[in-house]
């Protein structure tokens, strides 16, 4: 389980990205890089980390499911992820 402060920081970044998305796009299209650099650093989409929605783990996250590899395997074996089953050939 990731620290609550790390998860909260990432959520705060997501909110900032959403808030400044239109303004960033407008400034990029205008080529005004001076004004773009004045915006908060955390309003850039590259600062947001994909995290597991259950554990907050930041590595080994399947973006399609929003789960880390550990939780994905656990839930898939329990049959709790629709359409996912163990491979057999």
From Swiss-Prot:
The keyword rRNA-binding applies. InterPro entries: Ribosomal_uS14, Ribosomal_uS14_bac/plastid, Ribosomal_uS14_CS, Ribosomal_uS14_sf. It comes from the Bacteria. GO terms for molecular function: rRNA binding; structural constituent of ribosome. One of its GO terms (biological process) is translation. GO terms for cellular component: cytoplasm; small ribosomal subunit. Binds 16S rRNA, required for the assembly of 30S particles and may also be responsible for determining the conformation of the 16S rRNA at the A site. This is Small ribosomal subunit protein uS14.
